């Protein structure tokens, strides 16, 4: 591989939207939506269902990227996959993604 380029991009977000007010109720925290937004800029976030890991979400994103690029998994030389919330310390989430996506 002499040149690398981005053929397609994809993303996946879990369907469960959790607002700051939801968090406050869920965890009984003594704060407000405004306090959280003022300090973090975050108004809502997405939570994955139990048992859904980053490699599962990455698989959906990879499928979208491949469809956008008109490619098949076997056409790829490399998938660049980074996460701050891996499901496992070892092996890396990319190894799980590769296994789920196939050769």
What positions do the PLM features span?
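Conserved "HGTGT" condensation-loop signature of ketosynthase/thiolase-family condensing enzymes
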Residues: 1-80, 99-102
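Short Gly/Thr/Asp-enriched flexible loops that form oxyanion-binding sites at enzyme active sites
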Residues: 85, 89-99
